[in-house]
Amino acid sequence: MRGSGRASSAITIVNAFATGKGAAIGIELWTEARVRVTGDGEVRGKIVVKGEEFKDYRLVNSVISVLREVTGEPFGVRFEIHSDIPVGKGLKSSSAAANSLTKALVEALRLNIDDLSIVKLGVEAAKRAGVTITGAFDDACASYFGGLCITDNYEMEILVKREINPETVVLLIPRETVLTESLKGVDFSKISPFIGEALRLAISGEWKKALVINGLLYSTFLGYDLAPMREALKLGAFVGLCGKGPAFFAIADEPEEIIEAWSSFGDVIATSLR
């Protein structure tokens, strides 16, 4: 039995680290998973990220473990995952991988599971794999459904779900990598009152203001160089931090100006909201 699944990257509007509630918007960078379920109990396959093989299989094994519990069957899997989403940059690569693989397995196993439950299974797998701090339910929803998703990550409840115009978004991908597990134990409580204000802005519809406040707060707190944000703000852009970083993103009337201004800071990708 075969199945396939597809899920996207997303940008952070409000990071849930400080309050447990977060907001994200899907963007047009994709991860695709193809699977074949077997009866031999073996798991074999490959992950290819931006043309290079990726050999961390923790999340794959966690997704399979969760689905084995759902079915009660020790099925085997042959899998292929191909992704355009850089890993360790804050661009929701784990959420996209969990969503796409879970969706593919649900299809292959012919399970009658709705979309939101698929997302929640992927979040559970991500928690078990240790690739998320809060569960990243906001990221997972934006990755799966697209649009603006505002969620309570601890309760796994969607607070707001709204369609978004497909504006151009410019991504700055620095060379360094920051894995989410490296931030376990960091106390974000000191910035939670301010992040709470950003969340209220996002809920009220002013998500562009929210992403700037969120980006400035988390970038400062985590010690990132603010030069990319400063350059984008000078050009009138709405600029934020992708997850825990180090990637930044900007939404501007003249995206070409942002691309030029950011070219000296790292790799730059232009895509769109979805």
Swiss-Prot record:
Pathway: Metabolic intermediate biosynthesis; chorismate biosynthesis; chorismate from D-erythrose 4-phosphate and phosphoenolpyruvate: step 5/7. Pfam families: GHMP_kinases_N. It catalyses: shikimate + ATP = 3-phosphoshikimate + ADP + H(+). InterPro entries: GHMP_kinase_N_dom, Ribosomal_Su5_D2-typ_SF, Ribsml_uS5_D2-typ_fold_subgr, SK_arc. It is an enzyme of class 2 (transferase). Its EC number is 2.7.1.71. One of its GO terms (cellular component) is cytoplasm. It is found in: Cytoplasm. GO terms for molecular function: ATP binding; shikimate kinase activity. ATP binds at P86, V87, G88, K89, G90, L91, K92, S93, S94, S95, A96. HAMAP family: Shik_kinase_arch. Belongs to the GHMP kinase family. Archaeal shikimate kinase subfamily. This is Shikimate kinase.
